[in-house]
C-alpha cells in the first residue's frame, strides 16, 4: 500500500475563518505534485512534529478542561457565579478539542475530505459555535466582573446561580444562531487550477470563485467573533480600572475586614478574567489576520512558500491552544483551584471545605458569680457561637 503524502502549502485552500475543516484533494498527472519537493518540503521530521503538537494540544486540553468541569460539579464551594461562566468555557473548549482539532489533523495525510457533505456542515457548525461560546462568555463575564467591582458589597439575590445558568445557556443559543448560516451554506466544493492541472476539494462556506462572498465572510467573522466583543470587554475593563483607582482613595478600615476581603477577592477575579481575555485575543489574532489576508489579496490559491505554510501551521496551532490553556491559567492564578486541581489530578480526596464564616458569629459573654465558701465575686469570659440564620455571599470568587 502506497504511503499517503501530505499536501503542499499551495494545495490547501483556507476558506473559512478559524478554519478547522478545510481539506483538499489533488488529482494531477505530474508525479512531483504527490509529495512536497524542494525547499517547501517539511519532511518526515516536520510532519511528526506537527502531529505530536496536535496530540499534546488534544490530550492536555481534554485533561485540563475535564478536571476543571469535575472540580466545579464536585466542589460546592466552587459553584459560584464566575465559575459557572468559566465552566461553560470549558465545555466549549472540550467540544472543539474532541471534534474539530482531530479533523484538522487529518489534512496532512488524507488525500481528500474524509467526512462528506454532512460532516462538512456539522463540523463547521460546531467550530463556530465553540468560538462564539468562548468570546461571548468572556464578554458576559467581563460585564459581571464590572458590576461586582462597582458594587462590591451588594448581596446577590437568592436565585443568582439559576440566573447565571440561564445566561450561560443563552450564550450557547446565541452562538448556535450565529453558527447556523455556516452550517447551511458550507459544502464540499471542487476547485480547479488550470495552471497546474489539479483539482481541489474543500469544505468551505462559498465557492472559491465568489471573491466578494469570501471578503464579506472574513470581515463579518473578524468583527462579530473578535473586534466587537473585545471592544466591549475593553470598555468594561477601562471602567473597572477607573473604579479600582478611585477605590484606593477610600479603602475600608481594619474594622471592616469582611468588606476589605470581599473587595480584594473581586479585584482578583477581575484580573483572572482579564488574563483569559488576553489569552483568547493573542491566540486567535494570527488566524483571523491570515484569513483576512487570503480574502482580500488577489491570489486565488494559497501562497506556496514555506514561510506561508509555517505561519499557517503556527496560526492554527495557536488558535487550538486557546482551548487548553484556560485551566492552567486558572491553576497559576488561583490557589483554591490549584488545590482542587491537584486533588483531582492525583486522585486524592480534596480537603474538606471550611465552614462558612458568614453564617456564624463568635460572641464573648461576661459571666459574674460568687465563689462558694469565699463570698468573693469573680467575673469570667466565655465564647458563645451564635447562628445568625442569614446567608451572606462569602465564597463568590473562588477562581
From Swiss-Prot:
It comes from the Eukaryota. InterPro entries: Bombesin_rcpt_3, Bombsn_rcpt-like, GPCR_Rhodpsn, GPCR_Rhodpsn_7TM. Glycans are attached at residues 10, 18. One of its GO terms (molecular function) is bombesin receptor activity. One of its GO terms (cellular component) is plasma membrane. One of its GO terms (biological process) is adult feeding behavior. SUPFAM superfamilies: Family A G protein-coupled receptor-like (SSF81321). The chain crosses the membrane at residues 42-63, 83-103, 122-143, 164-184, 221-241, 273-293, 314-333. It is a multi-pass membrane protein. Keywords: Cell membrane, Disulfide bond, G-protein coupled receptor, Glycoprotein, Lipoprotein, Membrane, Palmitate, Receptor, Transducer, Transmembrane, Transmembrane helix. Residues 64-82, 144-163, 242-272, 334-399 are cytoplasmic. In germ cells in testis. Lung carcinoma cells. A lipid is attached at residue 347 (S-palmitoyl cysteine). It is found in: Cell membrane. Disulfide bonds join 120-203. Residues 1-41, 104-121, 185-220, 294-313 are extracellular. The keyword Transmembrane helix applies. Signal peptide: none annotated. Interacts with C6orf89. Role in sperm cell division, maturation, or function. This receptor mediates its action by association with G proteins that activate a phosphatidylinositol-calcium second messenger system. Belongs to the G-protein coupled receptor 1 family. This is Bombesin receptor subtype-3.
Amino acid at each position: 500500500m502506497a504511503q499517503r503524502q501530505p499536501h503542499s502549502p499551495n494545495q490547501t485552500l483556507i476558506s473559512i475563518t478559524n478554519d478547522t475543516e478545510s481539506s483538499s484533494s489533488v488529482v494531477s498527472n505530474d508525479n512531483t505534485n504527490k509529495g512536497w519537493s524542494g525547499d517547501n518540503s517539511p519532511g518526515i521530521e516536520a510532519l511528526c512534529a506537527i502531529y505530536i503538537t496536535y496530540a499534546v494540544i488534544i490530550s492536555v486540553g481534554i485533561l485540563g478542561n475535564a478536571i476543571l468541569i469535575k472540580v466545579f460539579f464536585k466542589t460546592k464551594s466552587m459553584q459560584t457565579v464566575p465559575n459557572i461562566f468559566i465552566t461553560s468555557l470549558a465545555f466549549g473548549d472540550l467540544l472543539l478539542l474532541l471534534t474539530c482539532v482531530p479533523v484538522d489533523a487529518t489534512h496532512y495525510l488524507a488525500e481528500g475530505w474524509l467526512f462528506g457533505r454532512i460532516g462538512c456542515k456539522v463540523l463547521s457548525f460546531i467550530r463556530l459555535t465553540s468560538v462564539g461560546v468562548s468570546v461571548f462568555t468572556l464578554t458576559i463575564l467581563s460585564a459581571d466582573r464590572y458590576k461586582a467591582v462597582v458594587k462590591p458589597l451588594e448581596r446577590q439575590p437568592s436565585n443568582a446561580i439559576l440566573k447565571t445558568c440561564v445566561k450561560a445557556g443563552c450564550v450557547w443559543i446565541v452562538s448556535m444562531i450565529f453558527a447556523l448560516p455556516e452550517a447551511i451554506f458550507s459544502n464540499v466544493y471542487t476547485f480547479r487550477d488550470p495552471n497546474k492541472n489539479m483539482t481541489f476539494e474543500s469544505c468551505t462556506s462559498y465557492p472559491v470563485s465568489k471573491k466578494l462572498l469570501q471578503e464579506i465572510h472574513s470581515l463579518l467573522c473578524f468583527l462579530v467573533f473578535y473586534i466587537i466583543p473585545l471592544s466591549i470587554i475593553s470598555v468594561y475593563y477601562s471602567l473597572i480600572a477607573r473604579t479600582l483607582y478611585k477605590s484606593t482613595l477610600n479603602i475600608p478600615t481594619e474594622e471592616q475586614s469582611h468588606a476589605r476581603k470581599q473587595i480584594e477577592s473581586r479585584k482578583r477575579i477581575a484580573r483572572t478574567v482579564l488574563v483569559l481575555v488576553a489569552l483568547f485575543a493573542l491566540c486567535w489574532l494570527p488566524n483571523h489576520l491570515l484569513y483576512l489576508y487570503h480574502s482580500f489579496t488577489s491570489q486565488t490559491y494559497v501562497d506556496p512558500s514555506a514561510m506561508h505554510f509555517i505561519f499557517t501551521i503556527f496560526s492554527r496551532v495557536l488558535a487550538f491552544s486557546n482551548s487548553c490553556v484556560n485551566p492552567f491559567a486558572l491553576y497559576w492564578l488561583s490557589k483554591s483551584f490549584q488545590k482542587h486541581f491537584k486533588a483531582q489530578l492525583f486522585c486524592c480526596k480534596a480537603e474538606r471545605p471550611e465552614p462558612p464564616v458568614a453564617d456564624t458569629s463568635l460572641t464573648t459573654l461576661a459571666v459574674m458569680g460568687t465563689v462558694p465558701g469565699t463570698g468573693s465575686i469573680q467575673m469570667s469570659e466565655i465564647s458563645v457561637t451564635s447562628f445568625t440564620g442569614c446567608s451572606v455571599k462569602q465564597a463568590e470568587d473562588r477562581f
